């Protein structure tokens, strides 16, 4: 390398802006060194990879280079575009590289290309690159294999991701974290928790990222025991003070029904961000503690943290679940007037629900028409649910008609309307709606419930016969129902009381709804006085709500149920929702 070239390379190594680079580039051209491989490589590297670089300038440099680019030259552009707002360009340069007669992809090329595939959500391209990785002999490389797992995971191909992971000869911590995150992200929370146990059996210790992914899964299935164990591990590896770990702990405790522990974590934090405050406000909201949510909101604003759209979602949830109509309206208004945030369909849905629960159905209808998303089926479905609660046939038909116009075919809507007709004793309309359900072959979402016993999470579905202890569970359930009846439980007519997308109700004392099976199993497998914590994917029906109240009284147990709508804390025959849900 000549002296001029060495001087220019040193200048490029110290370059920190495009303004300086352009000056250096002009010297390169004046001295006729624009095609010098080392100088070109340094120019390209800064433009493509540096934070202050320019991908458009990098592309111009690349396209005007007379010689054959090296593998590292291709990698700079593929890498640069993989991190940009145009990841598709990264794939286009990867394709061009494959057509090159000189340069071949290396493990860095595959990593950058797979990252782009992950971002553009292209399974065919991922499969194609996977084949190239195998042919190139890089599949045994932990970094490349992990990139494949991450790419398949991002595209929803969990089975392929799991297969690639299982076939890896060497798995590092990053590989385990990616696989755990994959299971957690797609809702396979039991698999995520099982993966952690497998990880421990292979002698791999987790880090803060492992814990955050696992805490998310614990939150979804209400695995409090597992969550508490992970909290201890966070303390042992001294990462509990990390804001994102503390936020995950607050979220987990709140969603597992342990607000006291969530508050404990919050109070112990030295630093808090908007997610910290949001986790607490939403936690109070879903537990029906609207007053406390508002109090936390005021503390948040006073501490100088600016609320965002999620903050107000938690506030409105709390107001809706506690019947705080006036307060809900006030905070909905200041969302835009004081904090300049634009409400979205979720905020409007909360307002429709707020008015609807309070019986102000006309206000619900006005809110829908006044919103910018009045064509969204969610709002009309929410109104329909309120019409069912308050037996308002007229507005129920308005909401149902609109849902049909929007072609928002949902079995739950028809079930709701059927219940409304049944409550109004309109036999003809009831029969017509049932006929529509059968003719369209509409299937309702099956109800399922989770309960954690020890470190194991058990899942039950309505009329479940798949559990290995099924016979014993049904026998226990019969005894539990009898004791609940002695305590005052009266099974309700499901046609009159079934809520939105509830389990299929049979209207008899031995109805085998998923939460009833979970409660029976919990009573079987825990000692007297142990709190039962159950998570349900649908809104709990009135019959099961009544059943759980009397079970808590008959067995002197606290039972915490998290359904699709909110938390219910049952104790001594009383629910924390005060039958307002």
From Swiss-Prot:
The keyword Transcription appears for this protein: no
Q: Name one Pfam family in it.
A: E_motif
Region named Type E(+) motif: 455-485
**Keyword presence, Repeat:** yes
Region named Type DYW motif:
486-581
The PPR repeats lie at 70-104, 106-140, 141-171, 172-206, 207-241, 242-272, 273-307, 308-338, 344-378
GO terms classed as biological process = RNA modification
Task: Please name the PROSITE patterns in this protein's record.
Answer: PPR
Type E motif: region residues: 379-454
Please give the family membership noted in the entry: Belongs to the PPR family. PCMP-H subfamily.
Q: In its UniProt entry, what is this protein called?
A: Pentatricopeptide repeat-containing protein At3g56550
* Lineage, broadest ranks: Eukaryota, Viridiplantae, Streptophyta, Embryophyta, Tracheophyta
* Primary gene name: PCMP-H80
């Amino acid at each position: 390398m000549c002296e001029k070239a060495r001087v220019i390379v040193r200048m490029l190594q110290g370059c920190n802006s495009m303004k300086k680079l352009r000056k250096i580039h002009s010297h390169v051209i004046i001295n006729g060194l624009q095609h010098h491989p080392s100088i070109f490589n340094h120019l390209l590297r800064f433009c493509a990879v540096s934070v202050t670089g320019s991908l458009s300038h990098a592309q111009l440099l690349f396209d005007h280079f007379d010689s054959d680019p090296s593998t590292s030259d291709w990698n700079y552009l593929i890498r640069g575009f993989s991190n940009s707002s145009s990841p598709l360009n990264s794939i286009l340069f990867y394709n061009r590289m494959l057509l090159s007669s000189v340069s071949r992809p290396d493990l860095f090329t595959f990593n950058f290309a797979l990252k782009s595939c992950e971002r553009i959500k292209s399974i065919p391209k991922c499969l194609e690159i996977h084949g190239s990785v195998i042919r190139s002999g890089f599949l045994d490389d932990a970094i490349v294999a992990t990139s494949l797992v991450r790419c398949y995971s991002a595209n929803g191909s969990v089975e392929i991701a799991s297969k690639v992971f299982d076939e890896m000869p060497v798995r590092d911590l990053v590989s385990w974290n990616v696989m755990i995150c994959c299971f957690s992200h797609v809702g396979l929370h039991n698999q995520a928790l099982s993966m952690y146990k497998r990880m421990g059996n292979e002698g791999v210790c987790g880090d803060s990222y492992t814990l955050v992914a696992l805490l998310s899964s614990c939150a979804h299935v209400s695995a409090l025991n597992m969550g508490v164990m992970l909290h201890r591990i966070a303390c042992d590896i001294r990462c509990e003070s990390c804001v994102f770990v503390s936020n995950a702990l607050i979220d987990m405790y709140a969603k597992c029904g342990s607000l006291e522990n969530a508050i404990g974590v919050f109070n112990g934090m030295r630093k808090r961000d908007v997610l910290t405050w949001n986790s607490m406000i939403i936690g109070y909201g879903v537990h029906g503690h609207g007053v406390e949510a508002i109090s936390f909101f005021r503390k948040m604003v006073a501490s100088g943290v600016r609320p965002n759209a999620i903050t107000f979602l938690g506030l409105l949830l709390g107001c809706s679940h506690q019947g705080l109509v006036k307060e809900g309206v006030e905070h909905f208004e200041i969302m835009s007037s004081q904090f300049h945030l634009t409400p979205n369909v979720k905020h409007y849905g909360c307002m429709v629900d707020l008015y609807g629960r309070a019986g102000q159905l006309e206000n619900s209808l006005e809110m829908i028409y006044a919103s910018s998303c009045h064509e969204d089926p969610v709002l009309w479905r929410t109104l329909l649910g309120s019409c069912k609660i308050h037996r308002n046939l007229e507005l129920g038909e308005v909401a149902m008609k609109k849902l049909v116009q929007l072609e928002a075919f949902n079995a739950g809507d028809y079930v709701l309307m059927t219940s409304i007709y049944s409550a109004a004793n309109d036999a003809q309309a009831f029969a017509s709606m049932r006929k529509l359900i059968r003719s369209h072959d509409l299937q309702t979402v099956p109800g399922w419930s989770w309960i954690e016993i020890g470190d194991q999470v058990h899942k039950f579905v309505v009329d479940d016969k798949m559990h290995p202890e099924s016979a014993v569970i049904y026998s226990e359930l019969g005894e539990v129902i009898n004791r609940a009846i002695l305590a005052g439980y009266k099974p309700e007519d499901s046609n009159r009381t079934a809520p939105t997308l509830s389990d299929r109700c049979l209207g008899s004392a031995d109805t085998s709804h998923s939460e009833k099976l979970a409660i029976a199993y919990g009573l079987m497998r825990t000692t007297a006085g142990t709190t039962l914590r159950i998570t349900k994917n649908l809104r709990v029906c009135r019959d099961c709500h009544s059943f759980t109240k009397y079970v808590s009284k008959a067995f002197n147990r606290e039972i915490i149920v998290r359904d699709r709508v909110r938390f219910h804390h049952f104790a001594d025959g009383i629910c924390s929702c005060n039958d307002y849900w």
